[in-house]
Amino acid sequence: SLVSLNEPKDEIYMESQP
């Protein structure tokens, strides 16, 4: 939820992928 590297389906995630 807080940090999903490559799971944009989560509620909030860091911008690891452009």
Swiss-Prot record:
It comes from the Eukaryota. GO terms for cellular component: extracellular region. Belongs to the PP3/GlyCAM-1 family. This is Glycosylation-dependent cell adhesion molecule 1. The gene is GLYCAM1.
